[in-house]
Protein backbone atom coordinates (compact mmCIF):
# COMPACT_ATOMS: atom_id res chain seq x y z
CA UNK A 1 0.00 0.00 0.00
CA UNK A 2 1.21 3.57 -0.60
CA UNK A 3 0.07 6.64 1.32
CA UNK A 4 0.89 10.31 1.57
CA UNK A 5 2.02 11.26 5.08
CA UNK A 6 0.71 14.63 6.24
CA UNK A 7 2.88 15.09 9.34
CA UNK A 8 6.17 13.20 9.17
CA UNK A 9 8.49 14.54 6.42
CA UNK A 10 10.05 11.15 5.69
CA UNK A 11 9.67 8.13 3.42
CA UNK A 12 9.25 5.06 5.59
CA UNK A 13 7.57 1.68 5.86
CA UNK A 14 4.67 1.17 8.24
CA UNK A 15 4.59 -2.53 9.00
CA UNK A 16 2.52 -5.11 10.81
CA UNK A 17 4.43 -5.36 14.07
CA UNK A 18 2.13 -6.36 16.88
CA UNK A 19 -0.08 -8.81 14.99
CA UNK A 20 -1.07 -11.76 17.19
CA UNK A 21 0.50 -14.43 14.96
CA UNK A 22 3.65 -12.65 13.83
CA UNK A 23 6.08 -15.04 12.14
CA UNK A 24 9.83 -14.52 11.97
CA UNK A 25 9.73 -15.14 8.20
CA UNK A 26 7.42 -12.15 7.75
CA UNK A 27 9.75 -9.92 9.76
CA UNK A 28 12.81 -11.14 7.84
CA UNK A 29 11.17 -10.37 4.49
CA UNK A 30 10.20 -6.83 5.51
CA UNK A 31 13.69 -6.19 6.85
CA UNK A 32 15.21 -7.49 3.61
CA UNK A 33 12.96 -5.16 1.62
CA UNK A 34 13.83 -2.14 3.76
CA UNK A 35 17.55 -2.87 3.61
CA UNK A 36 17.43 -3.22 -0.15
CA UNK A 37 15.39 -0.02 -0.52
CA UNK A 38 17.93 1.84 1.62
CA UNK A 39 20.63 0.74 -0.82
CA UNK A 40 18.61 1.72 -3.89
CA UNK A 41 17.06 5.07 -3.02
CA UNK A 42 18.50 8.08 -1.16
CA UNK A 43 15.01 9.32 -0.27
CA UNK A 44 14.20 6.24 1.84
CA UNK A 45 15.20 5.88 5.49
CA UNK A 46 14.39 3.67 8.48
CA UNK A 47 15.16 5.85 11.50
CA UNK A 48 11.88 7.81 11.45
CA UNK A 49 8.34 6.50 11.19
CA UNK A 50 5.41 5.31 13.26
CA UNK A 51 6.25 3.49 16.49
CA UNK A 52 5.64 -0.26 16.13
CA UNK A 53 2.64 -1.76 17.89
CA UNK A 54 3.34 -3.81 20.99
CA UNK A 55 3.05 -7.60 20.57
CA UNK A 56 -0.60 -8.59 20.23
CA UNK A 57 -1.78 -4.97 19.95
CA UNK A 58 -1.77 -4.30 16.19
CA UNK A 59 -4.81 -2.46 14.87
CA UNK A 60 -6.37 -5.10 12.63
CA UNK A 61 -8.75 -2.45 11.28
CA UNK A 62 -5.82 -1.16 9.18
CA UNK A 63 -5.12 -2.97 5.91
CA UNK A 64 -1.43 -3.77 6.46
CA UNK A 65 -1.76 -5.60 9.80
CA UNK A 66 -5.07 -7.14 8.70
CA UNK A 67 -3.48 -8.67 5.58
CA UNK A 68 -0.41 -9.85 7.50
CA UNK A 69 -2.50 -11.46 10.23
CA UNK A 70 -5.33 -12.88 8.10
CA UNK A 71 -3.26 -14.27 5.24
CA UNK A 72 0.28 -14.50 6.62
CA UNK A 73 1.25 -11.92 4.02
CA UNK A 74 4.32 -9.73 3.96
CA UNK A 75 2.25 -6.54 3.95
CA UNK A 76 3.66 -3.02 4.09
CA UNK A 77 2.57 0.57 3.71
CA UNK A 78 5.01 2.97 2.11
CA UNK A 79 4.47 6.42 3.57
CA UNK A 80 5.70 9.40 1.52
CA UNK A 81 5.75 13.06 2.58
CA UNK A 82 3.33 15.48 0.95
CA UNK A 83 5.72 18.44 0.99
CA UNK A 84 9.35 17.29 1.00
CA UNK A 85 11.64 14.73 2.56
CA UNK A 86 13.62 16.07 5.51
CA UNK A 87 16.25 13.42 4.80
CA UNK A 88 17.06 14.65 1.29
CA UNK A 89 15.32 18.00 0.84
CA UNK A 90 14.94 19.71 -2.52
CA UNK A 91 13.76 23.22 -1.53
CA UNK A 92 13.02 24.34 -5.10
CA UNK A 93 10.70 21.45 -5.99
CA UNK A 94 9.90 19.62 -2.74
CA UNK A 95 8.58 16.09 -2.99
CA UNK A 96 7.86 15.79 -6.69
CA UNK A 97 6.16 13.36 -9.07
CA UNK A 98 9.60 12.49 -10.48
CA UNK A 99 10.91 11.55 -7.03
CA UNK A 100 7.77 9.50 -6.39
CA UNK A 101 8.35 7.60 -9.64
CA UNK A 102 11.99 6.99 -8.72
CA UNK A 103 10.96 5.68 -5.30
CA UNK A 104 8.34 3.46 -6.94
CA UNK A 105 10.95 2.05 -9.32
CA UNK A 106 13.27 1.44 -6.37
CA UNK A 107 10.46 -0.39 -4.54
CA UNK A 108 9.97 -2.73 -7.49
CA UNK A 109 13.69 -3.45 -7.61
CA UNK A 110 13.74 -4.01 -3.83
CA UNK A 111 10.90 -6.52 -4.17
CA UNK A 112 12.84 -8.75 -6.57
CA UNK A 113 14.92 -10.53 -3.89
CA UNK A 114 11.73 -11.17 -1.90
CA UNK A 115 10.02 -12.77 -4.88
CA UNK A 116 13.10 -14.89 -5.57
CA UNK A 117 13.25 -15.93 -1.92
CA UNK A 118 9.55 -16.85 -1.83
CA UNK A 119 10.11 -19.00 -4.92
CA UNK A 120 13.14 -20.62 -3.29
CA UNK A 121 15.53 -19.13 -5.86
CA UNK A 122 17.79 -17.13 -3.53
Model-identified regions with their sequence ranges:
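Structured catalytic-domain cores with a bias toward divalent-metal coordination
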Residues: 1-122
Amino acid sequence: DVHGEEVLPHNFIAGFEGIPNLRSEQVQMVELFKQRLLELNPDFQTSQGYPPAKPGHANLGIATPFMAESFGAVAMTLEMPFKDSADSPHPAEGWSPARSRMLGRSCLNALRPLVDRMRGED
